[in-house]
Amino acid sequence: MSRSGVAVADESLTAFNDLKLGKKYKFIIFALNDQKTEIVVEETSNNSDYDAFLEKLPENECKYAIYDFEYEIGGGEGKRSKIVFFTWSPDTAPIKSKMIYASSKDALRRALNGVSSDVQGTDFSEVAYESVLDRVSKGAGSH
């Protein structure tokens, strides 16, 4: 339960584990239910196109998301995959929505074990592929 009293739905944890352990999904979009009492799965996808993921982030609404971010490691070391948690809170979203998403984030974030990086996005430049790649690949050779 978060400071805002919002709980994380069991389906949210199940979907996350399906992504993390079963590689069933490439990304998950989470939202607050209509009553603003629970964080639920809004959509899952196995589409590996990062632009398809970005298209699911609305211009005027807050969301949470998990993306299984895959990238090439330099020096011919192959691919690496990291699970990234997104808090999408666009500048154009209603203030009340931004406040409840901000105060509810910790409940979801704490429930999702195995996330490598956190990305806060208020506009699309902050969640662009290159921006996220820069964040997740820091120290890529040191793990």
Swiss-Prot record:
Belongs to the actin-binding proteins ADF family. Its main location: cytoplasm. It comes from Debaryomyces hansenii (strain ATCC 36239 / CBS 767 / BCRC 21394 / JCM 1990 / NBRC 0083 / IGC 2968) (Yeast). PROSITE patterns: ADF_H. One of its GO terms (cellular component) is actin cortical patch. Keywords: Actin-binding, Cell cycle, Cell division, Cytoplasm, Cytoskeleton, Nucleus. Controls reversibly actin polymerization and depolymerization in a pH-sensitive manner. It has the ability to bind G- and F-actin in a 1:1 ratio of cofilin to actin. Binding to F-actin is regulated by tropomyosin. It is the major component of intranuclear and cytoplasmic actin rods. Required for accumulation of actin at the cell division site via depolymerizing actin at the cell ends. In association with myosin II has a role in the assembly of the contractile ring via severing actin filaments. Involved in the maintenance of the contractile ring once formed. GO terms for biological process: actin filament depolymerization; actin filament severing; cell division; endocytosis; Golgi to plasma membrane protein transport. Pfam families: Cofilin_ADF (PF00241). This is Cofilin. One of its GO terms (molecular function) is actin filament binding. It is found in: Cytoplasm; Cytoplasm, Cytoskeleton; Nucleus matrix. It comes from the Eukaryota. InterPro entries: ADF-H, ADF-H/Gelsolin-like_dom_sf, ADF/Cofilin. Residues 5-137 form the ADF-H domain. PANTHER family: COFILIN-RELATED.
